[in-house]
């Protein structure tokens, strides 16, 4: 059951009984700015778990257009605001944006923003993937990022938060250091995997 898996991965540790967390420069608060920059397939492959575009007939131009607006307009407005305030972001990026919107990742790279993998497409869910299918999907993202950026992906956030019970193990096995699918705490905490801890 989920409760057993959760207890095995992230044992309960009330925030009131933990040692005080010390941030750099004795800051009282840490703010992590992580915009999701996603790409939704216009006519995505059929999915086992749910239809990415429930409105029929396909293509669902209305819902696709709302999401595509973010990559054409919204992201640039957000970058302007972050630049104005001197804020460096970590981008939760669907790797398909490297192909479809190269200007986006070029803008992120020019600002030395960290790129956190958000899967390939936000309409390519991992729910119901076999272990091998999910391992291959993670490797594909690592390979795309490595080829274009020359670095290893530091973190993982499954597309549409479509993680499986295997995801933490597969992410750690692939050499990724932190994992963002679980919203289970207010502080970064270790998550147990078969390949060492993730944060």
Specify the residue positions occupied by each region the protein language model found:
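Catalytic alpha-helical scaffold of carbohydrate-active enzymes acting on polysaccharides/glycoconjugates
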Residues: 2-155, 160-199
């Amino acid at each position: 059951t989920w409760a057993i898996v959760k207890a095995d991965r992230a044992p309960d540790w009330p925030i009131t009984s933990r040692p005080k967390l010390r941030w750099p420069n004795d800051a009282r608060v840490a703010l992590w700015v992580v915009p999701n920059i996603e790409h939704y397939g216009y006519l995505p492959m059929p999915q086992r778990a749910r239809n990415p575009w429930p409105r029929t007939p396909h293509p669902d131009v209305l819902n696709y257009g709302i999401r595509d607006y973010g990559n054409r307009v919204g992201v640039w407005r957000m970058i302007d605001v972050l630049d104005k305030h001197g804020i460096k972001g970590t981008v939760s990026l669907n790797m398909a944006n490297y192909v479809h919107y190269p200007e986006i990742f070029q803008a992120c790279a020019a600002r030395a923003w960290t790129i956190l993998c958000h899967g390939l497409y936000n309409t390519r869910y991992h729910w119901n993937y076999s272990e091998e299918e999910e391992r291959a999907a993670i490797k594909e993202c690592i390979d795309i990022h490595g080829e274009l950026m020359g670095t290893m992906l530091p973190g993982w956030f499954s597309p549409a938060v479509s993680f499986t019970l295997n995801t933490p193990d597969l992410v750690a096995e692939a050499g990724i250091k932190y994992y963002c699918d679980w919203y289970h705490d207010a502080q970064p905490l270790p998550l147990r995997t078969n390949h060492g801890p993730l944060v």
